Swiss-Prot record:
GO terms for biological process: DNA-templated transcription termination; transcription antitermination. Involved in transcription antitermination. Required for transcription of ribosomal RNA (rRNA) genes. Binds specifically to the boxA antiterminator sequence of the ribosomal RNA (rrn) operons. This is Transcription antitermination protein NusB. The keyword Transcription regulation applies. HAMAP family: NusB (MF_00073). Belongs to the NusB family. Keywords: RNA-binding, Transcription, Transcription antitermination, Transcription regulation. The gene is nusB.
Length: 143
């Protein structure tokens, strides 16, 4: 199983729920259908993720953990934003920050630098170089 791909799927699910208001339980149920069809919604410049390498249990744990601790995670993010309000963040950046903040706080088996590096890579892929720098700065303040 590939943790990088699993994080990417988790981030996409977080983004999807943030964008359309769907709850995370529904998104996890839909993931089963997505996995069976081997396709995640493709957007311009998004690469498809091969779900056979994705650790679905890890994705579920992350998604459920974020949902259960969302207020605490968002407070941690807010406390490390400089001259920004969480409401102004792009949905992609917010999803990446929530994912990594959860890992930093609750996934003790993952080194902080690995979580932050993965968040930066997700930002480069889905948001842009400036967002990657911004996310690195916010997460760097957390550790």
């Amino acid at each position: 199983m590939n943790r990088r791909k699993s994080r990417e799927v988790a981030m996409r699910l977080l983004f999807q729920t943030t964008l359309n208001g769907e709850n995370l339980e529904e998104a996890l149920e839909n993931l089963k259908d997505v996995r069976e069809s081997e396709e995640i919604t493709k957007e311009k410049d998004y690469e498809s993720v091969d779900l056979k390498d994705v650790d679905i249990d890890y994705v579920k744990r992350i998604i459920k953990g974020i949902e259960e601790n969302k207020e605490e995670i968002d407070e941690k993010i807010k406390g490390n934003l400089k001259n920004w309000k969480i409401e102004r963040l792009s949905k992609v950046d917010l999803s990446i920050l929530r994912l990594c903040t959860y890992e930093l706080k609750f996934e003790e088996d993952i080194p902080n630098r690995v979580s932050i590096n993965e968040a930066i890579e997700l930002a480069k892929k889905y948001s842009g170089e400036k967002s990657a720098t911004f996310i690195n700065g916010v997460l760097g303040k957390m550790i």
